[in-house]
A protein has these predicted regions:
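Enzyme catalytic cores with a strong preference for nitrogen-chemistry domains
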Residues: 1-317
Length: 317
């Protein structure tokens, strides 16, 4: 079984007060300062949390490889032979002028101008173009508004007052894994997506050898929310027999083995970095191949039981 060295960084930046005062370039300098004493030429991955690069609209997908941020990242990665940086970021794509929205999730920014905004994960490497994946399980009211045309005139302003959104994030309809030049395949799973077992198995069926979960659990505060998300991560490890590297902005960042055991973590509301050798897996579990078969069998038995009781009721009647 192949093992690789992975570093997980927990920046612990308060999103309510501090995060949005810094540019993406300034946020990247924090990464360099915090990680330089921990990563080496043996480190294959440096993992950062969801939405770390979130300044302004985020990363312009049309010019991602020609940005100041990308140049700074390349300069950093060139110091390490095989290092890959996986990080969460807000990203966007602006479309040419059009009377009608070019996609179902496009938001109008001016007359005839449209933009899609994404909650994305990126992989930056020193020998490949950037790879990205857009979060596809969105949080209602925070990342998208259902029945937007109907509800926006009624509750739009009310929702904004409580930190929600009347905009809609873009998604993608397939699970994209990140591949390195050493053919290491990792699954980029963003926050809320980790609670869906069958959703995560799509990455594994597409070849993922390791699950990477990035999250920004600072919004929860010190409640049960961030602990529950961590518990879901352990289930995903067991179901797929894949180790997990989990980076959360304020915690709990952790390494989880394929049996669902937390082998190292950074406590909530702490700044830190942890480094471990983690095993890669290629075998597909029965659950990953066939999905939540127990629930389907239970549902079938329930339906048959209801039909049986209904039949007996009719006979007695």
């Amino acid at each position: 079984k192949k093992e690789i060295e992975i570093a997980i960084l927990q920046p612990n930046i308060d999103p309510y007060y501090n995060k949005y005062k810094k540019s993406n370039e300034e946020l990247f300098e924090l990464i360099i300062n915090q990680s330089k004493d921990y990563i080496s030429q043996n480190t294959k991955y440096l993992i950062l949390p969801e939405g770390y690069f979130d300044s302004g609209l985020g990363i312009d997908l049309n010019f991602i490889n020609n940005s100041k941020l990308k140049s700074r990242i390349d300069k950093f990665l060139n110091q390490y032979k095989n290092l890959n940086l996986v990080v969460g970021a807000q990203s966007y794509k602006i479309y040419p002028e059009s009377k009608n929205p070019p996609t179902n999730t496009s938001n109008r920014i001016s007359d005839g101008r449209w933009v899609d905004i994404y909650n994305s994960a990126f992989q930056f490497s020193n020998d490949n173009e950037s790879q990205f994946y857009h979060k596809s399980k969105l949080v209602v009211g925070v990342e998208f508004m259902p029945y937007k045309k109907l509800l926006e005139p009624i509750i739009g302003e009310f929702l904004l007052d409580f930190g929600g959104t009347i905009a809609t994030r873009g998604i993608q309809n397939y699970r994209t894994n990140f591949n390195s030049k050493e053919n290491i395949i990792v699954a980029p799973i963003i926050c809320y997506e980790s609670i869906y077992g069958s959703f995560v198995t799509e990455y594994v069926r597409n070849g993922a050898q390791l699950l990477v979960i990035i999250s920004n659990d600072a919004w929860w505060g010190d409640t049960e929310g961030h602990r529950q998300l961590l518990s879901y991560s352990k289930l995903r490890a067991i179901e797929n027999r894949r180790a997990i590297a989990r980076s959360a902005n304020t915690g709990i960042s952790s390494f989880i083995d394929k049996n669902g055991k937390i082998i190292e973590k950074i406590r909530y509301n702490r700044n830190g970095i942890i480094v471990r050798n983690i095993g890669l897996e290629n075998k597909i579990t029965f659950y990953a191949k066939y999905g939540d078969y127990i629930a389907r069998i239970a549902l079938l038995m329930f339906i048959l039981n209801v039909l049986f009781l209904f039949k007996n009721f009719l006979i007695k009647k």
